[in-house]
From Swiss-Prot:
Subcellular location per the Swiss-Prot or TrEMBL entry: Nucleus, Nucleolus
Organism whose genome encodes this protein: Debaryomyces hansenii (strain ATCC 36239 / CBS 767 / BCRC 21394 / JCM 1990 / NBRC 0083 / IGC 2968) (Yeast)
Name of this protein: H/ACA ribonucleoprotein complex subunit NOP10
Source taxonomy: Eukaryota, Fungi, Dikarya, Ascomycota, Saccharomycotina
Domain of life assignment: Eukaryota
GO CC annotation: box H/ACA snoRNP complex
Keywords, sorted A to Z: Nucleus, Ribonucleoprotein, Ribosome biogenesis, rRNA processing
Complex formation: Component of the small nucleolar ribonucleoprotein particles containing H/ACA-type snoRNAs (H/ACA snoRNPs).
Molecular functions per Gene Ontology: snoRNA binding; telomerase RNA binding
Major location category of this protein: nucleus
Function summary: Non-catalytic component of the H/ACA small nucleolar ribonucleoprotein (H/ACA snoRNP), which catalyzes pseudouridylation of rRNA and is required for ribosome biogenesis. This involves the isomerization of uridine such that the ribose is subsequently attached to C5, instead of the normal N1. Pseudouridine ('psi') residues may serve to stabilize the conformation of rRNAs. The H/ACA snoRNP complex also mediates pseudouridylation of other types of RNAs. The H/ACA snoRNP complex mediates pseudouridylation at position 93 in U2 snRNA.
One Pfam family from the record: Nop10p
Transmembrane regions: none
């Protein structure tokens, strides 16, 4: 089982091990994507994060 999350009514993450909530909403994975040294789009991602003022890890 993997750790999953959904956003609560206050906007904070609510963690669960289920794939769906009791309301039938699909949860999202709480784990980051795998790292690949052959990442073709890292330059574009870094540029977009700088443009919109996001942290590099978001």
């Amino acid at each position: 089982m993997h750790l999953m999350y959904t956003l609560g009514p206050d906007g904070k993450r609510v963690y669960t091990l289920n794939k769906t909530t009791s309301d039938g909403e699909i949860t999202k994975s709480a784990h980051p994507a795998r790292f690949s040294p052959d990442d073709k789009y890292s330059r574009q991602r870094v540029t977009l994060k700088k443009r919109f003022g996001l942290l590099p890890t978001q």
